[in-house]
C-alpha cells in the first residue's frame, strides 16, 4: 500500500505500513479521522504528496470519513458549540442568488414537511437503532430546512446555492447514521456540525478552478493564518523564511505552498479605468511572428503566387499539393498521382519540370531576396 521510510527505524519504532494500518483500524472503528491525526502520525516518515493522496484515497475506499480544519470527532462539548438558533420557517433565497423553478419547487416541498418535537426525535432515533430505514428517511426529511438555513451562510464562496444544499444534505445523511440520542443533545444541534463539515469540505474541494487536495487546502489555510499573525506582530509582510520557521517547514516548502495557493486569473479580466482592455491583450504570444517577419512572409506569399501563375495549371497544382502550399500538408508522389489519375512517375516528371522553370533567372530573381 505504501513505501517504507527511507530512514532506518529506531528500536521499537513502527514501520510506515504499521502506522497506516493502525490509522485504518481506528478510522473503521470510529468512522472518521481528522487530517490533523493523519498528518501527525505520518509526519516522521517523509511521505510526499502523491503518497499522502494515495493513502487518503485508500481510507475513502475503506469507508473512513476524513474531516477538515483539524476538527476532532464531535464530542458533546464540541456539538454544544453548534447550538445556534436558525429560523427554519425562513426558506427565502439569499440576496443576489438566482434560482430556477426546480429549486423553488424543492424549497416549497421541504417547507411542507412538519418539524419534529423532541419526543418524536427520540422515537425516530430509537427506531433507527433497530434498523428502521423509514425512520432514517423521516428524520432526514424533517431537517432539510436546517440544511438550507446553514447553506445560506456559505453563499458567495465559489459554489452555487443548490450545490451547497446538496453537499449539506450529504452531511445530514451522515448525521442521521451516527446520531446517538443517549448523549443528551438535540438532533438539529448534532446535525449542524456534520452539515457544516460537509459544506466546508466541498468548498475546499470544488470551489477552486484548479482542484487542490483537501489536506493541502488545510496546509494552505494554516499558512494564511500564520502569515496574518506575523503581519500583526511584525507590522509588515513576513518573508518565506519567517513563515517557515513559524510552521516548522523549510523555506522551499513554504514557497511551494504559496505557489499552489495562487488563484488563477481570467484573461478576460478588465484592465484600465474604461474597462476597454483585457488582461489577455497584454500577454505576449510567444508563437506569433514579429511584425517585420509577418510583413516579409506576406510579401513572399504574394511573389510566390505571381511566380506560380507563370506555370501551367497542372504544374502549379502539383507543386501546391507536393509542398502543402495551401494547407501546410505535403503529399507523396503517389497521393498526388491519385488526385490527377496518373502514375507517381508522371507526377515526378511534372514536378521536376515545374521546378526547373522556377529556377530560371526570370522567375528566381523575384524570390532571391527572400532566400538570403
From Swiss-Prot:
UniProt-annotated location(s): Cytoplasm
Region of interest called Sigma-70 factor domain-3, as start-end residue ranges on this chain: 218-294
GO cellular component: cytoplasm
Signal peptide: none
CDD domains: Sigma70_r4
This protein's record includes keyword Membrane: no
GO BP of this protein: DNA-templated transcription initiation
Pfam families attached to this UniProt entry: Sigma70_r1_1, Sigma70_r1_2, Sigma70_r2, Sigma70_r3, Sigma70_r4
Name this protein carries in UniProt: RNA polymerase sigma factor SigA
Species the sequence originates in: Halalkalibacterium halodurans (strain ATCC BAA-125 / DSM 18197 / FERM 7344 / JCM 9153 / C-125) (Bacillus halodurans)
Main location: cytoplasm
Oligomer status and interactors: Interacts transiently with the RNA polymerase catalytic core.
Entry-linked SUPFAM superfamilies: Sigma2 domain of RNA polymerase sigma factors, Sigma3 and sigma4 domains of RNA polymerase sigma factors
Spans annotated as Sigma-70 factor domain-2: 139-209
Motif (Interaction with polymerase core subunit RpoC): 163-166
Alphabetically ordered keywords of this record: Cytoplasm, DNA-binding, Sigma factor, Transcription, Transcription regulation
Residue ranges of DNA binding: 333-352
Gene Ontology molecular functions: DNA binding; sigma factor activity
NCBIfam families reported for this sequence: PRK09210.1, RpoD_Cterm, sigma70-ECF
